[in-house]
Design a protein with these regions (language model features):
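A hydrophobic alpha-helical transmembrane-helix feature that marks the membrane cores
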Residues: 1-246
Length: 246
């Protein structure tokens, strides 16, 4: 999910020395515009997920079906993986519109999978966790955007840490260790806080060299990566701040 497809390098603009425009200023302006599209698309994806999730949670028939058919949940999980793989691997070979539709389809499927959280946790604690997540995500994304430090080494470390987190999570499905679960939750928060900054910096760097015909594609893959950072950070924070209805 973090193997981003890098768009073809920007082939440079034909700036005349006598032109009134400043190349550096133009690049900064274009990068800012692309990042706005990334954040907008990510936000729309989150809204799709929230709407679908609340709608499904409000359907007793859907929740009953999901509770009695575990294969359905795993089917949603597999569908999410397939959609992410298709978007990442085929990004440059599909139209910008197709990539956007697949992204929103992924957001919708994820909303269906996340519906149970509205049954397990109170609405107040979900809202509180969301605002904590939004504030944390926003702060780290701003840091990743404006920092002059190269986050590549940190990002690479976090990527491998993420793999370790996934393995530990699978192991804990069988061991059901409370202590390991707590460690996993803490590590998950730290990893996705860091990945938010790293992904933001990567997207900004890619935006500086993206040709006009690939801007829409970059907005989609950038939105997907930040969307995943936000959702995962939210879910790990929910383990700490979520209040059970029981």
């Amino acid at each position: 999910m973090y193997n981003q497809t890098t768009p073809p390098p920007y082939n440079g603009g034909n700036y005349n020395n006598n032109s009134w425009s400043n190349p550096t200023s133009n690049i900064v302006s274009a990068t800012s515009a692309i990042m706005k599209r990334v954040y907008l698309k990510m936000t729309l994806g989150l809204l799709v997920t929230a709407f679908i999730s609340m709608f499904c949670a409000g359907s007793s028939a859907y929740m009953q079906f999901m509770a009695t058919n575990s294969w359905f949940y795993w089917g949603l999980f597999i569908a999410e993986i397939v959609l992410v793989m298709v978007i990442s691997a085929r990004l440059t070979k599909m139209s910008s519109m197709a990539a956007s539709l697949l992204f929103y389809a992924f957001a919708a499927v994820n909303g269906m999978a996340l519906a149970p959280i509205f049954i397990v946790y109170t609405a107040t604690s979900i809202a509180k966790t969301f605002f904590i997540c939004a504030g944390t995500f926003g702060a780290m994304s701003v840091y990743g955007y404006f920092t002059t430090n190269d986050l590549t080494k940190v990002g690479n470390f976090l990527f491998y840490a993420l793999i370790g987190l996934i393995i530990a999570s699978v192991v804990n499905i069988f061991t059901k260790s409370t202590a390991l679960g707590w460690v996993i939750s803490c590590a998950g928060v730290l990893i996705f806080v860091g990945l938010t900054a790293w992904d933001t910096q990567k997207i900004k760097q890619m935006a500086q060299y993206t040709p006009a015909n690939m801007v829409g594609h970059l907005a989609t893959i950038g939105a997907l990566n930040l969307y995943l950072d936000f959702i995962n950070l939210f879910l790990y924070l929910l383990r700490f701040f979520g209040n059970s209805r029981d």
